[in-house]
Amino acid sequence: MGNFFLFAMTLVVCSVIVLLTGVADSAVICSEPTNLAEQYSQYMANATVSNMLEYLESSTAGGVASDEEEQLIYGNRICPSSIKAITTDPKSSVFERTTCPYFLVASHLSTRYPKIITEARCKCSGCVPLEENGHSDLTRCEPVYRPVRVLSRTGNCVNGVYQYAAAVHMKQEGCTCVRKTEALSGSGSGSNGSDDPIPM
C-alpha cells in the first residue's frame, strides 16, 4: 500500500511539472510579425492630422520606459560650468554651442517599431551662465519634443505572433533655455513651474 501511494504521488508530481512546463513554453512562443516594416509603411501612408492628434492625447512625453535602453552616440554628458567653456569651433554642432547643450543617444525599445530612435538628452538642468557659478534661478533647460509615428506592441499574441498598434512617440529633439513659469495661485505647484514638454 505504501509503495502504491508513493508511486501515485510521483505520477501526480510529474504530471504537474509537465503541465507547468507546457504552460511556460506556450507563454514564450511568440515572435515578431514578418511584415512589421510593411505595417509601419502603411501606417505612415494613411496617417492624417486628425488621427495624429488622437494618438497624441494618449501619448506620454518625457521619462524612459522600464525596458528601454540608451546608448550614447554623439557628444558627452558634461554640463559646461559657464559659457566660456562652450566651444567656439565653427565646425561644431549647434547643440554643442547652445546655452542648453545636449547629447544624442540611440534609444532602443524592443516593443516599439522602429526599435531604435535617435534622441537628444539635456546636459544641464539650468541654462549655462555667463560666469562660473552664475546659474540663474529664473531660467532652466527644457526638452523640446516632436511627435513621431511608431507602432507599439499591444501585449497580445495571436497565433504565435505579437500584435502591434499605431501610436505616437514624443521624440526629444533638443533642449532650449526658457524662463521659469510662475505657479498659479492655489495650484500647489512649486517655483519650477510647468513640466509640460515644449512642442516643435
From Swiss-Prot:
Glycans are attached at N46, N192. SUPFAM superfamilies: Cystine-knot cytokines (SSF57501). It is found in: Secreted. Induction: By bacterial injection. Levels increase strongly by 6 hours and slowly decline through 24 and 48 hours. Expressed in several tissues including hemocytes, gills, mantle, adductor muscle, labial palps, digestive glands and heart with highest levels in gills and lowest levels in adductor muscle and heart. Disulfide bonds join C122-C175, C127-C177. GO terms for molecular function: cytokine activity. InterPro entries: Cystine-knot_cytokine, IL-17_fam. One of its GO terms (cellular component) is extracellular region. It comes from the Eukaryota. Residues 1-26 form the signal peptide. Gene3D superfamilies: Cystine-knot cytokines (2.10.90.10). Belongs to the IL-17 family. This is Interleukin 17-like protein. It comes from Magallana gigas (Pacific oyster).
